[in-house]
Swiss-Prot record:
Example of a GO MF term: structural constituent of ribosome
Keywords on record: Ribonucleoprotein, Ribosomal protein, RNA-binding, rRNA-binding
Protein's UniProt keywords contain Hydrolase: no
Gene name in the database record: rpsT
Name recorded for this polypeptide: Small ribosomal subunit protein bS20
Top-level taxon of the source organism: Bacteria
InterPro entries, sorted: Ribosomal_bS20 (IPR002583), Ribosomal_bS20_sf (IPR036510)
PANTHER family recorded: 30S RIBOSOMAL PROTEIN S20, SMALL RIBOSOMAL SUBUNIT PROTEIN BS20C
Family, as annotated: Belongs to the bacterial ribosomal protein bS20 family.
Primary role: Binds directly to 16S ribosomal RNA.
Entry GO CC: cytosol; small ribosomal subunit
One annotated GO biological process: translation
């Protein structure tokens, strides 16, 4: 239990920030899953569109501070590696 007003305020803020971060993190994971599924389907055009959208969402999440920029770069790199292995 919080003993001060500022501690109570931080608890409220933490809940709000956690919900915000969870929303963007799950959105990012959803788009990455869609991209991986499109890559596995073998349709190059659909996979390319899905990968580009996933990269866009990953960049947005990094700009918002939900994930670190290096994590964003790593996720995009791994996604492109899968894409290139499948279609080259």
């Amino acid at each position: 239990m919080a003993n001060t007003i500022s501690a109570e305020r931080r608890i409220r803020l933490t809940k709000k920030e956690t919900a915000y971060n969870r929303y963007w993190r799950t959105t990012m994971k959803t788009y990455v899953k869609r991209a991986k599924k499109a890559i596995e389907s073998g349709d190059r055009e659909a996979a390319e569109a899905a990968v580009l959208k996933a990269q866009s969402v990953i960049d947005k999440v990094a700009v918002k501070g939900v994930i670190h920029k290096n994590e964003a770069a790593r996720r995009k790199s791994r996604l492109m590696k899968l894409f290139n292995q499948k279609f080259q």
